[in-house]
Each structure stands twice: as C-alpha cells, then as structure tokens.
From Swiss-Prot:
Predominant location category: plastid
Known role: Produces ATP from ADP in the presence of a proton gradient across the membrane.
Alphabetical list of InterPro entries matching this protein: ATP_synth_F1_dsu/esu, ATP_synth_F1_dsu/esu_N, ATP_synth_F1_esu_C, ATPsynth_dsu/esu_N
Organism: Cucumis sativus
Keywords in alphabetical order: ATP synthesis, CF(1), Chloroplast, Hydrogen ion transport, Ion transport, Membrane, Plastid, Thylakoid, Transport
Gene name of this polypeptide: atpE
UniProt entry tagged with the keyword Chloroplast: yes
Protein name: ATP synthase epsilon chain, chloroplastic
Length: 136
C-alpha cells in the first residue's frame, strides 16, 4: 500500500506521485506518515520533508518553506510557499546564501530586521540541510 503525495507551491507542482512513507516537519514537531494514517490537517514549518519511495530505499529530501498539509484516505497534499528538491539545489549557491543570511543576522538592527534575518537564516539552513541529507 502507498500514499499519493502532492507538494504544491503557488507557481508549480514540485512532486506528484506515490510514496511509501514521509516524515513531515509541522509547527508542533515531526510526524511520520504511512498508509492508512488518521486524517489530519496541520501547519507545515520551514524544514525538511523526507520521502521514502519503497521500504528498501533511502530518504529523498526536500526543503519546505512553510504552509499547510492535509492527510487522509492515503493522500497527502502539502501546500507551501516554496519548496525545492535537494537534487535541484545548487550546493555552492545554498552555502553562499547561508553565509549571507548569517552575516545579515549579525548586523541586524532592531526587532523587525532581526526577525526577518532569522527567517532568512532558517530558510537558508533548510536548503543546506536538504542537500546534506538530514540523518533519519
């Protein structure tokens, strides 16, 4: 038995196929989803989506930039602001973006700049973690 996983952004479909299981980062922590999972709707945090295509496969990773997920009837629909498969992320560009985000956080002045810099840093870290394959 499998799950039908769809990952959608406002501009494109990132993923639309069957998978064996996923691990999703929600605002209240990670959840594992297998076939016949109880129905749930949840907020998705900035973080890594782990996808296993078959029981013997390793994990594929994807960087998610926050949104919502609906799980039920062996279908998982994830609607996010943005998402990138690890295989689509340029490692050098991601590392450069992370370094810029860290520098921007160090020089942030005031509450608003600090909040924006922290958010940019979380996004940049997530992209780098997706490439490096977060340990399961």
């Amino acid at each position: 038995m499998t799950l039908n996983l769809s990952v959608l952004t406002p501009n494109r479909i990132i993923w639309d196929s069957e998978v064996k299981e996923i691990i999703l980062v929600t605002n209240s922590g990670q959840i594992g989803v297998l076939p016949d999972h109880a129905p749930i709707a949840t907020a998705v945090d900035i973080g890594i989506l782990k996808i296993r295509l078959t029981p013997n496969d390793g994990w594929l990773t994807m960087a998610l930039m926050g949104g919502f997920a609906r799980i039920g009837n062996n279908e998982v629909t994830i609607l996010v602001n943005d998402a990138e498969k690890a295989s689509d992320i340029d490692p050098q560009e991601a590392q450069q973006t992370l370094e810029i985000a860290e520098a921007n956080l160090r020089k942030a002045q005031g509450k608003r700049q600090t909040i924006e810099a922290n958010l940019a840093l979380r996004r940049a870290r997530t992209r780098v973690e997706a490439i490096n394959g977060v340990p399961s």
